């Protein structure tokens, strides 16, 4: 990099933008009937001059898709003539108008918006292979969304001492789509009010899934609901607190009931195995004589257990971890920890139940992307309901990413796109420099850059172009 004689000049007037992939995303939404679904269900505006409800919703979703960090970033797009021409828009709502739109929502209208998005989602699922969602995994968890605001309505102080909200997130693990988002005060526990939303998620995927499994941590082991879900044919794998009764039952098992738990490697080595690097942290901990807990071994067993509010017993899979407590080079004691998983699955062995339960941890990655990828949990507006609406509209950007991957003709590349972080998706698919040319009735995006996903981008665009509108 030796360039030093650098000058800047104004170019001749031309229309270009650095996120040409937005045209393909917009075309996908049109073919799926997303805007029509929103406008047909959501009635918040008395007069649709100059905007419809879908214009406001897509404006916030596209702001996230164009790497917008704040509501104020919408102003950049309002003044971008190439962006407006690329979407065939005369104008888009400004940040203040977008914030005002979120304050029009009540709980029913937020639900209506989510159902409009889910109706569009069903059209994506209809175009998938026959074995798609043969076994659907619905994951659920709560998280904290802090805010520095002093006047945010509905916020509360969480158990961590953070002011803000405590959203409930229900996702489909197979595609990493967000099915439902529920905003709650910051002092809400993870499972608070979750049952109706779990039931809605079940009804959403039931027409497509031959089998449904619910997964959650110990907070979601709702013993009053397990029998009902079991009678409906719904499977579940939930963590369970290691309270004294189940610990005593685990300790009373004969040693022959336990067998070593072998963890499968996370990936296969394609070339030759390499030497593992030295663990610098552990070396420092030993040298300094700090307290160090090291896993020595794991074993697994199972027994039947009937929770207090259940009318029948279920499998309780228990993992016993042998932890060596060390200080420097000296072993202080051997500590035994128990982890429990309750399930009504009968066709999986104990090791497979543990593996499936641990796979739910991938939902933490989805939550991270919602927080810092699409920035859906910044809570920038007035109160609990308006921030809930903002959260749903911004999270639509994450679902648009998933739908684009599901509609990609190259199935392998599409599944790879589902696993991508949001920022990588933006750089590979959305942030394609393009010149905007209006020719007759056509809007032409002339791509001016290249990456190794461009072949798949054009194949997907051709597929979307030929797709019959909903």
Regions found by a protein language model. Give the residues of each.
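Dynamic "connector" segments at or just before major functional cores
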Residues: 1-188, 194-207, 229, 405, ...
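Short, conserved catalytic/metal-binding motifs centered on acidic residues
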Residues: 59-60, 74, 92-94, 98, ...
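Domain-level cores of phosphate- or acyl-group-handling catalytic modules
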Residues: 190-245
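Short amphipathic alpha-helical "interface-anchor" segments enriched in bulky aromatics
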Residues: 74, 350-384, 388-389, 393, ...
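Structural motif
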Residues: 15-16, 46-55, 331, 381-390, ...
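C-terminal structured "cap/appendage" subdomains that terminate the fold
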Residues: 399-446
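An anionic, glycine-rich sequence signature occurring as long contiguous blocks
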Residues: 2-11, 235-366, 372, 459-470
